[in-house]
């Protein structure tokens, strides 16, 4: 059975249904010239868990990855995506739709049935650049508890786009009334705040949108800490230290955060009205399980960089925050990624004068 394929470096198009029903195909290696992935090209490829869209890919055909095994999808703003591209990807757990940088970039809509039947997808953030959500876009996403909308004005919404989902839609507090005034959106469960109950004194949080922690119902806002920008990953297998933690009441998108509060207390937070730009230099560098690391140095050892998709995981061992698994290059070779996984950790400096945190509870 076909498990791995290395396509020619000069290949520009993967034809319609080229690898359809290749049920054992797990790895696809292609060059930097590929522009088009045809209709149904990887349909029914259940073993294909990961597929990284390189910068050259501009067109993704209808049903391109329908019923594939993808678990994580990072899209690009300059892509045109056909209908039902990821339909029935039942293992899909994370989707990144980037904000487009200008009006000429075509990723401004969620196409018809694009994620329909993705039953494991728990949340998604739609950037302000999304102006249309088409029919059945998320129909049947039974686990979709959080749909985060960053646009100030309601997008054009097909009435069945969120059928057979929890229909929980979160918007900016200042824009809630605008969404309530739109009949299509008002038929959903519109909300402007989230709640988080802490089971231990310290916890972690990951969001791919700016977050503001607010006082509500007589409770103070929980305390959040982010790492200083001096932290840098140089060797993925080495333990690094966060030398200083900064206390904040808002966090920028894609930042790992440590929360402090009272156990068994419910705290409130919401989408920030403006990006938390003041925190741009307070980056910590943990990663989500499906994140790819990119090697930038010819020595094959140092200066790995991360895609903007991070996640902290607390361990039972006090004062250690494990970052989960990160997929790295085995060789510093163009077009090669994701071959090996490693675990690495961050340690908190336990000096209260610099961190404000004495211990971390699992």
For each predicted feature, which ranges?
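Structural signature of tandem-repeat unit edges
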Residues: 1-13, 23-36, 46-59, 68-80, ...
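Extracellular/lumenal glycan-associated surfaces
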Residues: 20, 135-140, 256-261
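A short, polar beta-strand/turn micro-motif
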Residues: 192-217, 247-311, 315-354
């Amino acid at each position: 059975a076909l498990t791995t394929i290395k396509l020619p470096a000069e290949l520009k198009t993967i034809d319609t249904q080229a690898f359809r029903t290749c049920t054992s195909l797990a790895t696809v290696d292609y060059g930097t010239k590929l522009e088009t992935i045809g209709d149904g090209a990887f349909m029914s490829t259940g073993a294909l868990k990961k597929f990284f869209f390189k910068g050259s890919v501009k067109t993704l055909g209808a049903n391109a990855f329908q019923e594939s095994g993808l678990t994580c999808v990072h899209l690009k703003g300059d892509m045109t995506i056909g209908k039902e591209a990821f339909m029935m990807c039942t293992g899909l757990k994370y989707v990144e739709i980037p904000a487009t940088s200008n009006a000429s970039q075509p990723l401004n809509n969620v196409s018809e049935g694009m994620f329909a039947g993705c039953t494991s997808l728990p949340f998604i953030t739609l950037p302000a650049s999304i102006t249309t959500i088409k029919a059945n876009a998320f129909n049947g996403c039974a686990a979709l508890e959080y749909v985060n909308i960053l646009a100030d004005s309601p997008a054009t919404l097909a009435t069945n786009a969120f059928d057979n989902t929890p229909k929980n839609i979160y918007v900016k507090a200042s824009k809630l009334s605008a969404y309530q005034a739109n009949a299509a959106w008002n038929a959903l469960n519109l909300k402007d705040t989230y709640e988080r109950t802490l089971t231990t004194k310290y916890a972690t949080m990951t969001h791919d949108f700016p977050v503001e922690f607010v006082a509500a119902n007589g409770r103070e806002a929980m305390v959040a800490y982010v790492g200083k920008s001096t932290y840098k990953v140089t060797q993925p297998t080495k333990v690094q230290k966060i030398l200083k933690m900064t206390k904040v009441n808002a966090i920028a998108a894609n930042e790992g955060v440590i929360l402090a509060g009272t156990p068994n207390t419910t705290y409130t937070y919401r989408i920030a009205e403006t990006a938390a730009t003041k925190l741009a230099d307070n980056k910590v560098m943990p990663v989500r399980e499906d994140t790819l690391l990119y090697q930038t140095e010819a020595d094959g050892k140092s200066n790995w960089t991360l895609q903007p998709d991070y996640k902290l995981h607390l361990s039972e061992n006090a004062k250690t925050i494990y970052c989960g698994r990160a997929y790295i290059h085995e060789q510093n070779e163009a077009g090669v990624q994701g071959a090996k996984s490693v675990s690495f950790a961050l340690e908190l400096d336990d000096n209260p004068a610099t961190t404000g945190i004495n211990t971390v509870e699992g």
